[in-house]
A protein has these predicted regions:
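Membrane-anchoring hydrophobic helices of lipid-metabolizing enzymes
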Residues: 1-80, 90-92, 101-103, 119
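Non-catalytic C-terminal accessory region of glycerolipid acyltransferases
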Residues: 2-4, 138-271
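Short, conserved catalytic or adaptor-binding loops enriched in Gly and charged residues
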Residues: 51-56, 115, 226-229
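Short, flexible loop segments at the rims of nucleotide/cofactor-binding pockets, characterized by
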Residues: 54-59, 130-135, 170-171
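Short, charged beta->alpha transition segments
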Residues: 60-69, 108-112, 141-144
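Hydrophobic beta-strand scaffold residues
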Residues: 61, 104-106, 154, 192
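Residue-level detector of flexible, active-site-proximal loop/helix-junction positions
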Residues: 68, 111-113, 129, 199, ...
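Catalytic core of membrane glycerolipid acyltransferases/transacylases, capturing the structured
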Residues: 73-74, 78-134
Length: 271
C-alpha cells in the first residue's frame, strides 16, 4: 500500500495543510511520486527498498575519505551524520547500511514512511508543538534504546532539522545536536560511526526556509531539493568506529554529544 509522499498531515490545521501541499506541488513532489510509482515494492526484500530508491533517484555516493565505511555485520551500532540535504541524507545512509545489514532503523520525519516497505525502518520524529509531540519523541527515544539493546543499528541525525546557512555563500551548519545521542551511548553498548555529508542545499532553499518559523513548513520545501539531487553524486567522509567504552568513560550525555559532533565535523579536514 502506497501513501502520500508529503509532509502534510491531518494533525495540522487546514490552512497549514493547504500551504504545505501547495509548496510541494510546485517544488517537485509529483516528480518524486512518479518515480516511485515505477517501483514494485512487493518483489523485493524490504531492507533493499532504500538501495532501490537511491537507484530510482539515480544517486551516486562518492566516499572522499581514506577511511572507508566499515559497518560490522552484527552488534549494536549508532551511525550519525550531519544533515545538509534532507530526505536524501536518510535515503543514502539507509542504502549504505542495507548493503551489510537488514536490522536497522532511522530516526527521522515520518514522511519517509510513505510505503509499507519503509515503515518498519522508521522511528518517527514529531516536529509539531505541544505535549503530545514531546510524548511521541520520548517514545521514539525509548524504542531506539530498546532496538540497540537488542543488537540493531540506529541511524541518527542529531541536529534534527536540516542544516542552514546564515549567509548565502557560507557553509550550512547543523543546529545544536540533541542529547539523545549521548543518552543512547550511555544506556546501550553501541559503538558509533560518524559520517559527514559534503555540501548544502541550493540558494533558494536557504533564502526561503530561513524565513519560515514552522519546522513542518521548512520540511515541505525539501521536495524541491530532493528533485534537484536526482542524478547527482553525493560526497561523504567516513570516520573510524568510536568504541562505546571510550564514550562511557566520559559519562556525560552533553560532553559525549559534543565530542561526537566535533569528530563528525572534522572528517573533511582529516581526509
Amino acid at each position: 500500500m502506497k501513501k502520500s509522499f508529503s509532509y502534510s498531515s491531518n494533525e495540522l490545521s487546514k490552512p497549514k495543510q493547504f500551504i504545505i501541499n501547495s509548496i510541494e506541488k510546485i517544488s517537485g513532489r509529483k516528480k518524486l511520486e512518479k518515480l516511485y510509482q515505477q517501483y514494485d515494492e512487493e518483489s523485493r526484500a524490504p531492507h533493499l527498498f532504500w538501495s532501490d530508491v537511491k537507484n530510482l533517484l539515480k544517486l551516486k555516493v562518492n566516499i572522499k575519505s581514506v577511511q572507508q565505511l566499515n559497518i560490522p555485520k552484527k552488534g549494536p551500532l549508532i551511525i550519525i551524520a550531519n544533515h545538509p540535504f534532507g530526505i536524501i541524507d536518510g535515503i543514502i545512509l539507509a542504502s549504505l547500511v542495507s548493503e551489510v545489514r537488514s536490522d536497522f532503523k532511522i530516526i527521522t520525519h515520518q514522511v519517509l514512511r510513505f510505503t509499507e516497505a519503509s515503515q518498519q525502518f522508521i522511528l518517527p520524529v514529531d516536529f509539531s508543538a505541544g505535549q503530545q509531540a514531546l510524548k511521541n519523541n520520548v517514545k521514539t527515544g525509548r524504542n531506539a534504546k530498546k532496538f540497540l539493546q537488542e543488537g540493531g543499528v540506529i541511524i541518527l541525525f542529531p541536529a534534527g532539522g536540516v542544516a542552514m546557512a546564515k549567509k548565502i555563500y557560507t557553509p550550512a551548519i547543523d543546529a545544536e545536536w540533541g542529547k539523545l545521542l549521548g543518552s543512547l551511548s550511555l544506556n546501550t553498548d553501541a559503538d558509533v560511526i560518524p559520517i559527514f555529508f559534503d555540501g548544502k542545499n541550493g540558494i533558494l532553499f536557504h533564502l526561503f526556509a530561513s524565513k519560515l518559523k514552522s519546522q513542518t513548513l521548512k520540511y515541505s520545501s525539501y521536495m524541491h531539493e530532493t528533485k534537484r539531487k536526482i542524478g547527482k553524486t553525493i560526497d561523504i567522509y567516513c570516520g573510524e568506529v568510536v568504541p562505546n567504552k571510550k564514550l562511557k568513560l566520559i559519562n556525560d550525555k552533553k560532553q559525549i554529544t559534543l565530542l561526537l559532533r566535533d569528530i563528525t565535523m572534522s572528517l573533511p579536514v582529516r581526509g
